[in-house]
């Protein structure tokens, strides 16, 4: 049951993040991910993970947690305010005070619900801000993370040690119903990274909808199919956790699902060339989004 709730939370997060990714924003707020950055992501992620693992082993755990909790809480406050998108001064003050109150409550109690709220703000905003520039880049990123996740979960104790040893709002957690003292968890990386591909497919659908005159009612096809595939991947992950009774690299199941779903959709619709040639955040795409908003 915990797995179903965590999976539902992940689906809600990627849905909101994908929708937000198509909203008009200031150019400096957009972080475009190209193929070079896609290759560097797992490298930097691996280095960071190992450094955190070494810090946990050889430094004071309490000191490390305090620093990371403070940093994560500050980032969550910024993301939480951004989620409300207040237009007035009063709205900005209200949103800021509300987010600070939640962060302080988490900092004081470490309650899992407050942690999840902050984690949601981080994840949804990350999906909306970080934007993959093409399907090829997304496939490269998820493909690299596929091997990254397998190695660090099955090949070493690093990821499991860091995930369970550091209590920061960088994962969704839920007390197990049979044993409330134990927590089920889903890392934000398993939400944000596939979510970037889902967000790209949402923008691709928007692009296709504007340019298509033959099938205007099927403008959510790619996003819908990839969203379903992601949900099925989460289901397989939960089954693997239940069957093997051990930590699982979620991207082992989620990466192939989110890579193959758009590919099969494009193949079935005879749109492989269109999918491979689409580039996100071009001037044309921005114009198309503006047109869509005005209709």
Swiss-Prot record:
<keyword id="KW-0812">Transmembrane</keyword>
<feature type="transmembrane region" description="Helical">
    <location>
        <begin position="64"/>
        <end position="84"/>
    </location>
</feature>
<dbReference type="GO" id="GO:0006465">
    <property type="term" value="P:signal peptide processing"/>
</dbReference>
<feature type="topological domain" description="Lumenal">
    <location>
        <begin position="161"/>
        <end position="183"/>
    </location>
</feature>
<feature type="topological domain" description="Lumenal">
    <location>
        <begin position="57"/>
        <end position="63"/>
    </location>
</feature>
<feature type="transmembrane region" description="Helical">
    <location>
        <begin position="140"/>
        <end position="160"/>
    </location>
</feature>
<comment type="similarity">
    <text>Belongs to the peptidase A22B family.</text>
</comment>
<feature type="transmembrane region" description="Helical">
    <location>
        <begin position="184"/>
        <end position="204"/>
    </location>
</feature>
<feature type="transmembrane region" description="Helical">
    <location>
        <begin position="90"/>
        <end position="106"/>
    </location>
</feature>
<feature type="transmembrane region" description="Helical">
    <location>
        <begin position="222"/>
        <end position="244"/>
    </location>
</feature>
<feature type="active site">
    <location>
        <position position="149"/>
    </location>
</feature>
<dbReference type="InterPro" id="IPR006639">
    <property type="entry name" value="Preselin/SPP"/>
</dbReference>
<feature type="topological domain" description="Cytoplasmic">
    <location>
        <begin position="131"/>
        <end position="139"/>
    </location>
</feature>
<feature type="topological domain" description="Lumenal">
    <location>
        <begin position="107"/>
        <end position="111"/>
    </location>
</feature>
<dbReference type="GO" id="GO:0005783">
    <property type="term" value="C:endoplasmic reticulum"/>
</dbReference>
<dbReference type="GO" id="GO:0000139">
    <property type="term" value="C:Golgi membrane"/>
</dbReference>
<feature type="transmembrane region" description="Helical">
    <location>
        <begin position="1"/>
        <end position="21"/>
    </location>
</feature>
<feature type="short sequence motif" description="PAL">
    <location>
        <begin position="249"/>
        <end position="251"/>
    </location>
</feature>
<keyword id="KW-0256">Endoplasmic reticulum</keyword>
<feature type="transmembrane region" description="Helical">
    <location>
        <begin position="112"/>
        <end position="130"/>
    </location>
</feature>
<dbReference type="GO" id="GO:1990578">
    <property type="term" value="C:perinuclear endoplasmic reticulum membrane"/>
</dbReference>
<keyword id="KW-0333">Golgi apparatus</keyword>
<feature type="topological domain" description="Lumenal">
    <location>
        <begin position="245"/>
        <end position="249"/>
    </location>
</feature>
<dbReference type="GO" id="GO:0098554">
    <property type="term" value="C:cytoplasmic side of endoplasmic reticulum membrane"/>
</dbReference>
<feature type="topological domain" description="Cytoplasmic">
    <location>
        <begin position="22"/>
        <end position="35"/>
    </location>
</feature>
<feature type="transmembrane region" description="Helical">
    <location>
        <begin position="36"/>
        <end position="56"/>
    </location>
</feature>
<protein>
    <recommendedName>
        <fullName>Probable intramembrane protease C25B8.17</fullName>
        <ecNumber>3.4.23.-</ecNumber>
    </recommendedName>
</protein>
<keyword id="KW-0472">Membrane</keyword>
<dbReference type="GO" id="GO:0042500">
    <property type="term" value="F:aspartic endopeptidase activity, intramembrane cleaving"/>
</dbReference>
<feature type="active site">
    <location>
        <position position="190"/>
    </location>
</feature>
<keyword id="KW-0378">Hydrolase</keyword>
<feature type="topological domain" description="Cytoplasmic">
    <location>
        <begin position="205"/>
        <end position="221"/>
    </location>
</feature>
<feature type="topological domain" description="Cytoplasmic">
    <location>
        <begin position="269"/>
        <end position="295"/>
    </location>
</feature>
<dbReference type="GO" id="GO:0036503">
    <property type="term" value="P:ERAD pathway"/>
</dbReference>
<dbReference type="InterPro" id="IPR007369">
    <property type="entry name" value="Peptidase_A22B_SPP"/>
</dbReference>
<keyword id="KW-1133">Transmembrane helix</keyword>
<feature type="topological domain" description="Cytoplasmic">
    <location>
        <begin position="85"/>
        <end position="89"/>
    </location>
</feature>
<dbReference type="Pfam" id="PF04258">
    <property type="entry name" value="Peptidase_A22B"/>
</dbReference>
<dbReference type="GO" id="GO:0098553">
    <property type="term" value="C:lumenal side of endoplasmic reticulum membrane"/>
</dbReference>
<keyword id="KW-0645">Protease</keyword>
<dbReference type="GO" id="GO:0033619">
    <property type="term" value="P:membrane protein proteolysis"/>
</dbReference>
<feature type="transmembrane region" description="Helical">
    <location>
        <begin position="250"/>
        <end position="268"/>
    </location>
</feature>
């Amino acid at each position: 049951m915990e797995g179903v709730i965590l999976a539902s939370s992940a689906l809600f997060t990627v849905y909101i993040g994908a929708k937000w990714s198509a909203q008009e924003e200031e150019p400096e707020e957009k972080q475009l991910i190209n193929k070079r950055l896609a290759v560097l992501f797992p490298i930097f992620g691996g280095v960071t993970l190992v450094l955190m693992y070494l810090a946990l082993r050889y430094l004071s755990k309490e000191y490390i947690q305090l620093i990371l909790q403070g940093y994560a809480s500050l980032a969550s406050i910024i993301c939480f305010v951004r989620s409300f998108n207040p237009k007035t001064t009063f709205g900005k003050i209200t949103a800021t005070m509300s987010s600070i109150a939640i962060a302080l409550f988490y900092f004081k109690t470490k309650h899992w619900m407050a942690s999840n709220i902050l984690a949601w703000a981080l994840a949804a905003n990350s999906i909306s801000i970080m934007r993959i520039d093409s399907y090829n880049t997304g496939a490269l990123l998820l493909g690299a993370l596929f091997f990254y996740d397998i190695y660090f979960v099955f090949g070493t104790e690093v990821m499991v040690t860091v995930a369970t040893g550091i209590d920061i709002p960088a994962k969704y957690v839920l007390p197990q119903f049979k044993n409330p003292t134990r927590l089920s968890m889903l890392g934000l990386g398993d939400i944000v990274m596939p979510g970037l591909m889902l967000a790209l497919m949402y923008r691709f659908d928007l692009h296709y909808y504007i340019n298509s005159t033959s099938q205007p009612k099927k403008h959510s096809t790619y996003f819908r199919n990839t969203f379903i595939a992601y949900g099925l991947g989460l289901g397989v992950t939960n089954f693997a956790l239940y069957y093997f009774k051990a930590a699982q690299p979620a991207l082992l199941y989620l990466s192939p699902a989110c890579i193959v779903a758009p590919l099969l959709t494009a193949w079935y619709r005879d749109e492989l060339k269109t999918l491979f040639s689409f580039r996100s955040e071009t001037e044309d795409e921005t114009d198309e989004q503006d047109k869509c908003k005005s209709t």
